């Protein structure tokens, strides 16, 4: 995997072969971060990375200046890899928790500007991730949830859904915690 922009642009990170995570493609990651960059000041946001996998998205956030990222990853080997890699890049800016995502959602008392979730595409009830973020009030006012998922899934009926973007086989659905009743469109 490669960091596409920021302080560590071009850096290649090679995950151990025993990690089963599927990193987000560079093409999709570049599209996603173009959208986020036009809507957030990265130096001022707090990020939660759910189902962090190899840490690919976390590394992109810290490369772009995010100072506070929490990663939740269920695999001990993956969590260890993320911690070691993030500590080399940006010591003290990334907290990695090796735990079940749903347990974290239920017990978390912090608020986030951006929550990124990349659950396994084949995970049943993937919508429980979206429900959990909103039920447990993890987004600050104006905060976004970005869910990576397969093309088969649609979330257009969810009350916080804003829009969906496609990048090859990768899809991102954007959900917004409204400060007001009006829904803002994602600025590209």
Language-model region placement:
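Class I S-adenosyl-L-methionine-dependent methyltransferase catalytic core
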Residues: 1-188
